[in-house]
Amino acid sequence: AVLGCYLNLANPDEGQLAKITHRYLAHIRFASLLGVGVVGTETGAVNEAYKFEEKNHSDEALDIFIQNVKPVISYAEKMGVIFAIEPVWKHIVCNPKRARKVLDEIASPNLQIIFDPVNLLDISNYQNRDVIIEEAIELLGDDIAMVHMKDFVVQDGKLVSVAAGTGEMNYEKIIRFIKERKPYIHVTLENTTPENAVQSK
């Protein structure tokens, strides 16, 4: 099971950041007490609103996130909990290479990855999705703790998330990765409703 705590570890306000860090530590503590193996999160933005801006993709933003996540990982190690980050194109850890850098700099077995292929995509790169997915599997595969499955369609010049199997995604590489390298991994279906549940299987 995964306990989600999707807050902004790059919040520039020191007071808010302290509260956010405390919330993460509390989630890790409760995860340990409840027998939840993973606390999951995304990687934030350089503004208080947690919105996309180009600075999110800067080296400075990545350094800020790495420094701010270190005490969280240290506590996860003490509590025996996996802390898994989910790369998202709009956020600081926006691609597989940046995720790999975080893993290498932290160098902790308690820091792992939630792999959501659609979250790595944007209107600017979705046509290269097969290459992006291959890169993610190559760079991050050993450290993936969970997979999120959904799909996307293009509407009004933007990607819109939809239930798995109802959009433009090709799952062949993802399914092969799961079968060959992570046969017992947990996979969750996102954007799934009673109306599309059968189709999403």
Question: Model features per residue range: what roles?
Answer:
Residues 167, 172-174, 179-181, 185-189:
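H/E-rich (His + Asp/Glu) clusters that bind or coordinate divalent metals
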Residues 3, 66-168:
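Acidic/histidine-rich catalytic cores of soluble enzymes
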Residues 31, 36, 144, 183-184:
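A structural motif
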Residues 9-113:
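Active-site acidic/histidine proton-transfer and metal-coordination neighborhood
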Residues 12-18, 51-54, 124-128, 160-163, ...:
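Short, solvent-exposed loop/turn segments at secondary-structure boundaries
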Residues 188-199:
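A short, acidic, flexible beta-alpha connecting loop/helix-capping segment that sits on the rim
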Residues 43, 151, 191:
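Short secondary-structure boundary segments
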Residues 1-3, 39, 147, 187:
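Hydrophobic residues within beta-strands of alpha/beta enzymes
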